[in-house]
């Protein structure tokens, strides 16, 4: 999500362009509209420092009703259609009442810190620098989003304000820890009479259905997978590094003040590396052949978007008439590579 790289405290405003206005400026790629995010700039005056921080708590709103372990045992034992094997299975671990939704969900605590400083150097070089840190835990256990951001903005003016410059640079580092969302489905359907872990040394200690109810027996191929093992036996993370920079020059020609020249150059670069490791003992991928158990998948992508826009605009009022003409050139190069 491109917006995940934007620090909300750096945003000054949102502008939405749609219909012909967006297409006229950005071409066919803007046929569905354009959202322009304007970030905060420096201001003339003495240095001012701002800090903001918050702690948030997230929790699930509702819980799916399912039988407890005791309710499920009673249901099977008193069911005239239950087989001997079914009755034996629910009595393997007497007294166990596992709430699988509680085992995979949590009350998540997240923190965010932002600090910025802005001012100007001798009234002609306004600046703003900012740093931000976000650590967001997900409601699903093991999931996490961590982000570092840093930005610099310079907006100097020269030649009696005839030349305005807008220089921006932003660096972003994001670390994602992904959780297997299949655990949510499994938590609503896995047997509540079974423990999270049992006395086995074959499936990482996690309860796993076997063909003969032996904790170290042969895994039953058609049975569901322990939802907690889906979370704790898989390490799926990615690291994203991004740089966004642009330089804009707006010049009101000295000898012809009705003529403005505007140049904007920018680059958006992102590189992401991911690593998904599944433990060989993971019940979901376990095989009797150790060489065919578990997995390790490395993935990456690299994206680079460069842009150059130049236009000249002449605007003049003649009595009751307004004359406005614009000519420009736009160049964009997009590169994407992945495995």
Enumerate the language-model features and the residues they cover.
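Residues embedded in well-ordered regular secondary structure
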Residues: 1, 33-34, 41-142, 161, ...
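Short, glycine-/polar-rich solvent-exposed loops and beta-turns at beta-strand/coil boundaries
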Residues: 6-9, 26-31, 143-146
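Membrane-embedded beta-strand positions of outer-membrane beta-barrel proteins
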Residues: 49-53, 129, 167, 247, ...
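Short beta-alpha junctions and helix-cap segments that line functional grooves
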Residues: 2, 21-25, 35-36
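Flexible loop and strand-edge segments within Gram-negative outer membrane beta-barrel domains
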Residues: 92-104, 108-132, 136-143, 149-223, ...
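Non-catalytic regulatory/gating segments with a bias toward low-complexity or hydrophobic composition
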Residues: 14-15, 35-37
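Short acidic/polar hinge/loop motifs at secondary-structure boundaries
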Residues: 1-19
């Amino acid at each position: 999500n491109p917006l995940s790289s934007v620090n909300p405290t750096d945003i000054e405003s949102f502008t939405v362009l749609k219909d012909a206005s967006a297409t006229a400026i950005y071409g066919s790629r803007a046929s569905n509209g354009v959202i322009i995010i304007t970030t905060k700039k420096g201001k003339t005056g003495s240095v001012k420092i701002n800090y903001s921080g918050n702690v948030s708590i997230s929790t699930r709103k509702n819980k799916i009703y399912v039988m407890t372990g005791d309710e499920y045992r009673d249901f099977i034992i008193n069911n005239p259609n239950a087989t001997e094997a079914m009755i034996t299975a629910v009595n393997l671990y007497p007294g166990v009442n596992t709430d699988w939704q509680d085992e995979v969900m949590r009350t998540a605590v997240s923190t965010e810190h932002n600090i910025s400083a802005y001012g100007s150097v001798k009234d002609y070089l306004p600046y703003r620098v900012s740093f931000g840190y976000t650590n967001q835990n997900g409601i699903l256990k093991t999931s996490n989003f961590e982000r570092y951001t840093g930005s610099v903005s310079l907006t100097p003016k020269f030649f009696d304000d005839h030349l305005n410059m807008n220089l921006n640079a932003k660096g972003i580092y994001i670390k994602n820890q992904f959780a297997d969302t299949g655990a949510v489905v499994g938590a609503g359907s896995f047997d509540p009479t079974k423990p999270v872990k049992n006395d086995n040394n074959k499936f990482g200690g996690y309860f796993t259905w076997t063909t003969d109810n032996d904790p170290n027996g042969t895994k039953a191929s058609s049975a569901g997978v322990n939802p907690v093992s889906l979370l704790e036996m898989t390490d799926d993370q990615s690291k994203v590094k991004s740089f966004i920079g642009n330089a804009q020059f707006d010049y009101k020609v000295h000898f012809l003040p009705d003529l403005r020249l505007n140049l904007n150059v920018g680059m958006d670069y992102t590189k992401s590396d991911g690593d998904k490791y599944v433990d060989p003992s993971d019940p979901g991928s376990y095989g009797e052949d150790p060489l065919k158990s578990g997995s390790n998948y490395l993935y990456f992508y690299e994206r680079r978007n460069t842009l150059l826009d130049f236009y000249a605009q002449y605007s003049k009022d003649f009595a009751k008439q307004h004359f406005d003409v614009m000519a420009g050139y736009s160049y964009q190069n997009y590169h994407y590579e992945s495995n």
